[in-house]
């Protein structure tokens, strides 16, 4: 909703004679003189530069969000129901880039509204609808993450594709309710003005209500939700630190979703998949170490058989370290046969030791994942506030104290274009930090390119 709000603020600053009701480039003032299109406030070089920058922003927004949609719909790793939020969010940002930003750019460069009053009303409603929908989607995603952290088991059972789609419909309905007033209350231009303009209702009640509904209320909800998530993460990190040490008799640990302090779920990767083996150990190195352990076990078993020592029981050391040692110590020979009870003890000790190692690994993965998750939340909140807060704060101040609180026009324009940048940054925030999206992007872009080269 930035561009119509900018037009309304500029109309108030320029006075009533700056507005017009014409359809196109000309108008007639109160004295009956015919005016042509107003002179542009930018030089030819500035027009070309601004058009290039905004054009790149539009293309980047469309391409990035289209990649998000394709990745979620085609990648098996991204078919979780909650990723439908990202599809809907990307769709809203694509619509902002295609149906709002080009007309905002034309209105800015030409210094008047060229496209007529009918499209002006539609344009105002679409602007508010898509931008508000983008913000409300971020709010819905934050609530989804909060419930998945605090009510992992119950919420996972409830979070079906049908429920997620119903939530998405509710998001669009809320955005439509907020954006509907511009269709019936957009700025009414006075008769006899020189140039046509397109702006929202300039009354204080509309400015404040739209700012609260489109920004401040969702921002407050997101702040409270992310603060709660951060507190839960800190609490579980502290709990893990206190419990650090040897695992219990069964090697068990608490489990939750999303890796926030859960030992079992923390073994999952960045997107809930099982964590791969250690990446710093190559297969050849692992097999070589395995062969060395087996040779050592063979030598120890041979020495035990020569000495006539019976294989140990539950306190087994070398055999417990490797299944290979167990197979050797079971080989026939004087004093070298394990009893059935000793064999069960060895198997129990081996499984217990494997669980203990797995528990320690899961603790480390959980702590690392909590830090990464907290960082992503900080990026989401920081970019969201950075993009939208300056515009909505200055716009609401203008609605309260008018000219006394009005910012310089160039600064106000900069604030509202920064708000549009949020649509292009959403794919970066929600995908670049995600390995599955990175792999899917590479698969989409480079595999098709290779096919083109082969053909």
From Swiss-Prot:
Pfam families, sorted: 7tm_1
Where does the chain cross the membrane? Answer: 48-72, 85-110, 121-143, 165-187, 204-227, 377-400, 414-434
What is any one GO biological process for this UniProt entry? platelet activation
InterPro entries listed in its UniProt record: ADR_fam (IPR002233), ADRA2C_rcpt (IPR000735), GPCR_Rhodpsn (IPR000276), GPCR_Rhodpsn_7TM (IPR017452)
Which SUPFAM superfamilies did the record assign?
Answer: Family A G protein-coupled receptor-like
SMART domains named in the record: 7TM_GPCR_Srsx
- List the carbohydrate attachment sites: 17, 29
Q: Where is the composition biased (Basic residues)?
A: 291-302
| Gene Ontology MF term list | alpha2-adrenergic receptor activity; epinephrine binding
Q: Where is this region: Disordered?
A: 241-340
Q: Which residues lie on this side of the membrane: Extracellular?
A: 1-47, 111-120, 188-203, 401-413
Coiled-coil spans in chain: none
Q: What is its main location?
A: membrane
Q: Which residues lie on this side of the membrane: Cytoplasmic?
A: 73-84, 144-164, 228-376, 435-455
Q: Name one GO cellular component term.
A: plasma membrane
Q: Where is this site: Implicated in catechol agonist binding and receptor activation?
A: 210, 214
Where in or outside the cell?
Answer: Cell membrane
Point out the annotated site residues (description: Implicated in ligand binding): 127
Q: Which cysteines are joined by disulfide bonds?
A: 120-198
Q: Which UniProt keywords apply?
A: Cell membrane, Disulfide bond, G-protein coupled receptor, Glycoprotein, Membrane, Receptor, Transducer, Transmembrane, Transmembrane helix
- Task performed by this protein: Alpha-2 adrenergic receptors mediate the catecholamine-induced inhibition of adenylate cyclase through the action of G proteins.
| Family as reported in the entry's similarity comment | Belongs to the G-protein coupled receptor 1 family. Adrenergic receptor subfamily. ADRA2C sub-subfamily.
Q: What is this protein called?
A: Alpha-2C adrenergic receptor
What organism is this sequence from?
A: Cavia porcellus (Guinea pig)
**Gene name of the record:** ADRA2C
